[in-house]
């Protein structure tokens, strides 16, 4: 209900004027293809410490009488860069319904500079607003000094009004984020109550952007 596509590692962001001027997109363009065509090599499902078979027909045997204290789903991705490298993504679900996401990039020498590294979550419907605890305004690694820590609510999810659309909306050093929406693709719902998705840091603060377009669309 919250996801339009399966979450995947992302290596590409929208270009900026500085990128175009320095020809960054030419030097690091291989990450665009890696972002678009990343290959999932392996899926592991672990239930209470025991590995399960993740594919049909074996995974059709789970009924309402099957219980577990913890489920871990691990994905191993391989990039189509030269040389290739791998990214490990694991989702750990506990009995409370909380999902912990861990992402590990296995770096190798010889690859160009990263445009960005993270996870992309695409929602099926537009968000109304978001609330977060972190730095004020748009912040980037070189623009954090002028920001203030606090809790901020953003109701305008449109792009920053640059003459040429480009990367925007980044929020650095975030402790938690709450995305609110009231529209879904669930036709069985007759109410229009707001729904909230909360994302919290594990041990380190994170950066995020919440935009109505993907990087390739921008």
PLM features per residue range, with description:
Residues 1-218:
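Beta-strand/loop-rich accessory regions of lumenal/periplasmic or secreted enzymes
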